[in-house]
Amino acid sequence: MLALWILFLLGMSTLGLVLFAAFSNKKAAQYLPPSGTFAQLGTTKLHYVDQGQGPVIVMVHGLAGNLHNFTYGLASPLAKNYRVICVDRPGCGYSERPGYADSSLEAQADTLALLLDHLAIESAVFVGHSLGGAISLAMAQRHPEKVKALALIAPLTHLPDGPAPVFKPLDIASPVVRLLLGWTLAVPGTIYRMNASLKVIFGPEKAPADFALRGGGILALKPKTFITASSDLQQAKSSMPSIEEGYAGMTTPTSVLFGREDRVLSCKQNGEDMTDRIQGLQLTLVSGGHMLPVTQIEQSLQFVETVAGKATGLAS
């Protein structure tokens, strides 16, 4: 009898967690609904925001992020002179990726190539932040004819020995466990760790008060954000070695902007050391943390405009 009661209580607790996750998912969507356009690209339904006219810039966000990381402050100023396309990576934000689909970093780069084909765009400047930097590098290696230049902001370029402590809860190898946690404990855990996580991800700078809505932070309360981020973390482990092997043969003009006090990725390994790994790479170091597209908009804007101006012939 006691065993039955324990099973009953466990079942009710699990049901409560699932219902809370569903409620959180719904509220996040209500507060920050899709703001762009959808394109069916193979197995991926990609959500993107397309604004401005001129030479094309494609912006690729990082782990557990979404396109609002760029629309927060970078996209609109750039759109005065460029056509700026901010994407929700496959499975992130409002982009959809089935569980059976190839979710490697290379496959995500291929999806971006499909987006350019879908929009009849021959080539673009790619701006990649964090994990989006690694995917942009894969894009330049696999589809060099489609990449005019790379402007990488705090990019993942080197596979570390393990994930940053703030991302340890995402380090789950089993897709089944990942799914179960995503719809039970992940959202309460995210809420519990929110303030501590933001201090690391943004530190030593502070997360702006309006980041939840303007910067897309509230979408972290969607179960699929956890599920996709956990999957992406595993995919980075398997994809990065081959991406790193490709550095020596790259000819795409590549520039990197990195914060010296980045608490998520090593500035030395992912920034400073890259000058010896990719020929001609231009490195800019600033005082700051990992979320430069949000915390240092003017610096990031100047960086992207300089890279894009050289690549497209427009004055920076």
Residue spans of the language-model regions?
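Conserved alpha/beta-hydrolase catalytic His-Asp/Glu region
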Residues: 26-28, 164, 186-249
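Active-site loop/oxyanion-hole signature of alpha/beta-hydrolase fold enzymes
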Residues: 42-43, 49-51, 86-127, 131
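Alpha/beta-hydrolase fold catalytic core
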Residues: 1-57, 80-82, 122, 309-316
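Acidic catalytic loop of the alpha/beta-hydrolase fold
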Residues: 261-265, 291
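Conserved HGGG/HGGXW glycine-rich cap/lid loop of the alpha/beta-hydrolase fold
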Residues: 51-94
